[in-house]
Swiss-Prot record:
PANTHER family: CX9C MOTIF-CONTAINING PROTEIN 4. Disulfide bonds join 7-38, 17-28, 39-50. Belongs to the CMC4 family. The twin Cx9C motifs are involved in the recognition by the mitochondrial disulfide relay system. A motif (Cx9C motif 1) lies at residues 7-17. It is found in: Mitochondrion. Residues 4-46 form the CHCH domain. Keywords: Disulfide bond, Mitochondrion. This is Cx9C motif-containing protein 4. A motif (Cx9C motif 2) lies at residues 28-38. The lineage of its organism: Eukaryota, Metazoa, Chordata, Craniata, Vertebrata.
């Protein structure tokens, strides 16, 4: 049986929040932050749900390292 994603609960909370708030992301910042905290607790690649945040962080690092 496949192992459950460790941050699935937080991802579901985001979906519930977005649905309850007409998909206004600004109203769900607290639950989004909880998912970020969950993702930070696990090694890269451990959570499929966190892969979007991991990609976002990689892009930020690339931009910081790119000479202007």
């Amino acid at each position: 049986m496949p192992q459950k994603d460790p941050c699935q609960k937080q991802a579901c909370e985001i979906q519930k929040c977005l649905q309850a708030n007409n998909y206004m992301e600004s109203k769900c910042q607290a639950v989004i932050e909880e998912l970020r905290k969950c993702c930070a607790r696990y090694p890269k690649g451990r959570s499929l749900i966190c892969s979007g945040f991991e990609k976002e962080e990689e892009e930020k690092q690339t931009l910081k390292c790119t000479p202007q």
